[in-house]
Amino acid sequence: DKDTYKVSGGLHGVGVSCVNALSSLLVATVHREGKVFQQKYSTGNPQGAVEVVGQSDRTGTTIYFEPDATIFATTEYKYETVSKRLRELSYLNKGIRLTLTDLRETDEQGRHLYEEFFSEGGLKEFVEHLDSTRQPLLPAPIHVEKTDGDIPVEVALIYNNSYSENVFSYVNNINTHEGGTHVSGFRRALTRTLKSYADKSGMLEKAKVEITGDDFREGLTAVISIKVAEPQFEGQTKTKLGNSDAIGAVDNAVSEILGYYLEENPREAKLIIQKVILAAQARQAARKAREMVQRKNVMGGTSLPGKLADCSDTNPERCELYLVEGDSAGGSAKQGRDRSFQAILPLRGKILNVEKAQEYKIYDNEEIKNMITAMGVTFGTEEDSKALNLTKLRYHKIIIMTDADVDGSHIRTLILTFFFRYMRELIEQGYLYVALPPLYIVKKGKEERYAWSDAERDAIIREIAPEGKEDSVGIQRY
């Protein structure tokens, strides 16, 4: 309804009507014209007429609601979720002050948990917040703010010393996780404008390297926010924008202001283009490294890593691969496995932290090469030369099995990071698992029991040892 709201989340959103229908009690209180008006509802039905309940010298609306416990299994709100969303909204709507108070608990001084969210810089501050743990390449974010036709466009972007792309997009304050036409417009403008500048500067010709769109986005953090009167989303969840006019609006705004920025800031422009050239060189090196890993696999036939204790079954649906921490753990894992369907691959030490390494170095890493070879995966499909190809995947269960200590947690995190960044399809298709190691083994005589917590350990001791004979129980901490 454009007469009521200039922009909104569009149809089918979880607005006040939906919240009202799903609440056992909703109270709407409105301050206007010197009075306080109030109406109560239950499961969407008015419990009486609108009443005047007092006088007021201000304006505003308060909504109080209690979720219906007959509909929701859980009616408890997570403070962190609400806090994160309000912080996000404060950046997207600069100059607006939002407050969050949790009345459920108090601290030692009897105070309720309270936060205030306010952003004067808007998306520029948002980008700095997102990049707070990275080293920036530019002294300040590049800021785009322009209305193209009927579409207000705001973008903030900055480059950092990482190798990943982080682009966050919003339409009418809704987070469009899957992107859409506004992100397409941004990428088109970024690639074209930077390519044009790089060509004119002569830096590309000097470097003798071929650039692709991905190279312009390595180490980029950006937030895109547009306002559209009638948003068209693909799917009910509103995670992808479909409005075709958003492409041109974002493209025009970003092209114009980014072009000015590059001309007026030649030092920063040179840093960006140097970063792009390095990304292109690293991409070509990574492609060669990937091809080398795959060529060895092909030329070697069924040559598998020497440390792999493979299983006898060849049906991937029945086979499991355990990635274990070191040779000693690999030895005990081999002793305890069922060799018909369980394979063991010991990994030596901590694998490479792929979050901080260039891609070509990843495929040179011995442990990562062993994992790729053992799993049988390749890179490259008809649609995408970098995409993971799972047609020859040898195991449908890949289990990360590390120790229950700090080192084990670190190794597990490094392995998960590799899979998330370079083999996400394995996670999405449900092939990746994490083993939950016990913390203790409790022994008494020939009896051995495992415990996954201190409480479970104590319960086992009470169960197997008479009172006063606890010393007869042996406990080993893993």
Curated annotation (Swiss-Prot):
Binds two Mg(2+) per subunit. The magnesium ions form salt bridges with both the protein and the DNA. Can also accept other divalent metal cations, such as Mn(2+) or Ca(2+). This is DNA gyrase subunit B. It comes from Eisenibacter elegans (Flexibacter elegans). Belongs to the type II topoisomerase GyrB family. It is found in: Cytoplasm. The gene is gyrB. It catalyses: ATP-dependent breakage, passage and rejoining of double-stranded DNA. A type II topoisomerase that negatively supercoils closed circular double-stranded (ds) DNA in an ATP-dependent manner to modulate DNA topology and maintain chromosomes in an underwound state. Negative supercoiling favors strand separation, and DNA replication, transcription, recombination and repair, all of which involve strand separation. Also able to catalyze the interconversion of other topological isomers of dsDNA rings, including catenanes and knotted rings. Type II topoisomerases break and join 2 DNA strands simultaneously in an ATP-dependent manner. Gene3D superfamilies: 3.30.230.10, 3.40.50.670, Histidine kinase-like ATPase, C-terminal domain. Its cofactor is Mg(2+); Mn(2+); Ca(2+). PANTHER family: DNA GYRASE SUBUNIT B, MITOCHONDRIAL (PTHR45866:SF1), DNA GYRASE/TOPOISOMERASE SUBUNIT B (PTHR45866). Mg(2+) 1 binds at E325, D403. Heterotetramer, composed of two GyrA and two GyrB chains. In the heterotetramer, GyrA contains the active site tyrosine that forms a transient covalent intermediate with DNA, while GyrB binds cofactors and catalyzes ATP hydrolysis. GO terms for cellular component: cytoplasm.
